[in-house]
């Protein structure tokens, strides 16, 4: 699966790392401590240094992306899977990376974001997409 989808792997990996590029460009404007985690109530409850926030979170997501791709490609039953479902494996983490890092940078620049309102809706949309492509 990975050999015939090399371009997808490269493009999805670049998309996951795009927030790090934004962080490098905006490095001097970012505060030294950045909110990287919010509780279920939408309040910030986790802070990280600028280096981890800019580089660590995209790298962790990239590693997780590679692990998901590896396990999916090693699955003997993946040939029987719907190709759209397999394609979702390539694009879930890039979308999550852009969204979560976008929220993180938005908070770093002092912009409000009502996470408690949007997260249930976004999780619902994600489950709808996943539910439509899982085998029955």
Locate the predicted segments by residue.
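Feature 926 captures the class I aminoacyl-tRNA synthetase adenylation module centered on the KMSKS loop
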Residues: 2-34, 39-136
């Amino acid at each position: 699966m990975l050999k015939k989808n090399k371009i997808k792997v490269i493009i999805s990996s670049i998309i996951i790392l795009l927030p790090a590029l934004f962080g490098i460009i905006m490095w001097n404007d970012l505060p030294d401590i950045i909110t990287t985690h919010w509780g279920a109530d939408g309040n910030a409850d986790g802070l990280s240094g600028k280096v981890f926030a800019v580089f660590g979170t995209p790298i962790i997501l990239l590693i997780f992306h590679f692990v998901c791709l590896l396990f999916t490609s090693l699955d003997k039953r993946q040939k029987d899977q719907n190709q759209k479902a397999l394609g979702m494996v390539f694009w879930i983490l890039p979308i999550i990376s852009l969204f979560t890092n976008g929220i993180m940078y938005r908070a770093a620049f002092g912009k409000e974001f009502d996470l408690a309102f949007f997260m249930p809706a976004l999780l619902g949309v994600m489950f709808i997409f996943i539910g439509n492509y899982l085998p029955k």
